[in-house]
Amino acid sequence: MRPETAIIEIHGQYRIHTEFYGNPAAQQTIILVNGSLSTTASFAQTVKYLQPHYNVVLYDQPYAGQSKPHNENHTPISKECEARILLELIERFRAEVVMSFSWGGVATLLALAQRPGRIRRAVVNSFSPQLNPAMLDYLHRGLDYLAACDRTQIGNLVNETIGRYLPQLFKRYNFRHVSSLDEHEYHQMHFHIREVLRLNADSYTESFAGIEIPMLFMNGELDIYTTPHEARQFGQLIRGAEFHTIRNAGHFIDVEHKAAWQQTQDALLAFLRPQRTQPLNPIYRPQPNGASVPLAALAS
């Protein structure tokens, strides 16, 4: 099913490309927040199991994907700004659920800390409150390559680290995507990494402790960058936190293989629809089409 697309102006400053996958029978709308260099295409597999149950909203950040031509992109934007964009889109689409992937979790949690009245539940995938040695090494290497605008090294870094468990087909498209971005996108990622490195435990405690809605944190068993164990530290900050580990999966969980995709679908729907009837089961079928292949990001 093709989505309805639109360019939405936010705060008179940003123009955001959105995709709306409508379901006439759905009673709720879920908005998905991708990573820093990812686009709406990164959620191609996720939409397959969500759209039979929900209205689904995807969007590109102002500096990325199909939003990029509609914005000047002279100055990097902060995660706080991304959180404000998300809050506005939640209102525009009347979303009740938000779900993020990897570093999209920062903007999502910052937005949830504002206690948006519409949101009833949230899911955060492949994210942790702790920057462990593996993640720090990845980020510092990324800073060097981004500062030099070394496209080949940036593409290789993603595939060799957080993307190590992706199928080869996805790795090829991943490399093509990450190594062919505009320079302002690399500058944006460099800015975001520096933001992330300045975060500390106190910042998380102060910002996120007020979140009171039920939340599910999902991480891959094999992910050494945002580990399931470290993600559980959110339980000390967020009262309604639940946790689920996707077996035999790395950072990109549901796009890595069929079993991980099914586990992610089952855990997500069990959390969002605890009284649901037997869900529809779409088919996991990686697409050999660049437009629909999930794309990684340097810090996703």
Curated annotation (Swiss-Prot):
Pathway: Polyester biosynthesis; polyhydroxyalkanoate biosynthesis. Residues 29-253 form the AB hydrolase-1 domain. The keyword Lipid biosynthesis does not apply. Keywords: Transferase. GO terms for biological process: biotin biosynthetic process. The keyword Lyase does not apply. Gene3D superfamilies: alpha/beta hydrolase. One of its GO terms (molecular function) is pimelyl-[acyl-carrier protein] methyl ester esterase activity. Its EC number is 2.4.1.-. It comes from the Bacteria. Catalyzes the transfer of the acyl moiety from in vitro synthesized 3-hydroxydecanoyl-CoA to acyl carrier protein. PANTHER family: HYDROLASE ALPHA/BETA FOLD FAMILY, PIMELOYL-[ACYL-CARRIER PROTEIN] METHYL ESTER ESTERASE. This is (R)-3-hydroxydecanoyl-ACP:CoA transacylase.
